[in-house]
Amino acid sequence: MLIVAFKPGHDGAVAAIGDRRLLYSLESEKDSRPRYSPILATTVLDLAERLGEVPDVVALGGWSDLRPNRISYTGAGYSGIEEPTVTTSRFFGKEVKFFSSTHERSHIYMALGMAPRDDSPVQTVLVWEGDVGAFYVIDGHQRITRKVQVMSGPGARYSFLFGLADPTFPTTGGKPRLNDAGKLMALAAFGDSADADADITHVVERILKQDSMYPAPKGEYRDSVLYNAGVESPECKIAAALLTERLFETFAEVARQEMPEGSPLYISGGCGLNCDWNSLWAQLGHFSSVFVAPCTNDSGSALGTAIDALTTFTGDPHVDWSVYSGLEFVTDTQPDPARWTSRPLEHDELSGALAGGRVVAWVQGRWEIGPRALCNRSLLAEPFGAVTRDRLNEIKQREDYRPIAPVCRVEDLGKVFHEDFEDPYMLYFRRVRESSGLRAVTHVDGSARVQTVRDSGNPQMHRLLSAFAAQRGVGVLCNTSLNFNGEGFINRMSDLVLYCESRGISDMVVGDTWYQRAEG
């Protein structure tokens, strides 16, 4: 059975599952399109070119848009856990099953289908994102038996705090911005919730109790200490730490009281990208295990709708998948030989260049699904100097308070971090050992968001890390996404060359070829 699913709205994507295996998950923002792009015709054509047949099932994820005088619905709509609709339709001349289920269900089934198989009689799913904030009990037949509502819009509330402090965010008519949550997560590390005074605490509690964040009610907070205070102000940093703490406490208390103890927890929705919260869920002790998919936000929604369809027709949501299920790199041009030389990749020599302070644009295989660069579309650099962090943020044209993540081979985890658990998708924080000297990748609170690498998971990166370890003692590098500011991952040679030449990067690796900027 071949299933093709479409995700409307922001973070547009298409996904294809064939015989219970993820074939492709293609986000329209990738290949240097604007972040959060709606589904593009080119994305659909990219998938159609690579599939050998017309699908048996066409699945449309639900969505809704807030218009000036009404709500416009696509497919099954945004909210709800009602049973999907299945009808017969035609698709390019072939009779197909047409399937549609809500956006809320796409998050639930994305988590269920990507999680490891578990024979527990019940499972718990948490969906927390821009609009939905609820737990779900799943029975042994993969059916939703209970929904426990916690809070509407946890992600929107979190993002709103950033907009409240940001003088550039409109006072009326705005919506919480999709990219603000990650920035607030970075700022929260600079603050301490214990420093919150009565004014800051009052604002945070107001945000938690606000009826709706659409449109963002910034004007109602004109009298608050946080109104246009500046996102790097002490007040904003303290409030960010407090809101981070209070949101988690609210959901954790419901989990302890309402959700089956000892069940596995599967986390879905954009809040699943918050490494602080993921770490706290893992430490809670109420659940037997915690799973977060690399595409836990809306980048995995098309895949979730496809899995929902698979479950409807087969009774089993589980799929075989790889995080590297995007498109292969496109060689649409060759670097100008007058400006670039090429040579076969030698890992030992490249690690020497990295140890000497060079920044390397690193491209391998198919792009990663989800928003995190997992060493197939990455900028790499040595991890020891704070100046390296500043240089990478300058290259990426982003705020200097943003941390740089490390990639570490599993053999070195215990040497440089206090916790040595594996995290191949970069979804949890851990504490950096002060003796490691990893200043470029240590955030202000002593934490790091680490991608761990095994030889079996990413052999090219593991080999490079091993070569770097032979020279510098540990297999750790800076690893940040290879993209123009405000765009998805770079995926073609013309964009890669433009990026490197415009940002002073002299080394590019594509597959087994190392390109170096010619001197002179």
From Swiss-Prot:
Entry GO MF terms: transferase activity
Pfam families listed in its UniProt record: Carbam_trans_C, Carbam_trans_N
E.C. number: 2.1.3.-
Summary of the function given for this chain in its UniProt record: Catalyzes the carbamoylation reaction in the cephamycin biosynthesis.
Top-level division of the source organism's lineage: Bacteria
Enzyme class (EC, first level): transferase
Signal peptide span: none
Protein name: 3'-hydroxymethylcephem-O-carbamoyltransferase
CDD domains the UniProt entry points to: ASKHA_NBD_CmcH_N
Protein's pathway: Antibiotic biosynthesis; cephamycin C biosynthesis
Keyword entries, A-Z: Antibiotic biosynthesis, Transferase
InterPro entries: Carbam_trans_C (IPR031730), Carbam_trans_C_sf (IPR038152), Carbtransf_dom (IPR003696), NodU/CmcH_Carbamoyltrnsfr (IPR051338)
Family statement drawn from the similarity comment of this UniProt entry: Belongs to the NodU/CmcH family.
GO biological process: antibiotic biosynthetic process
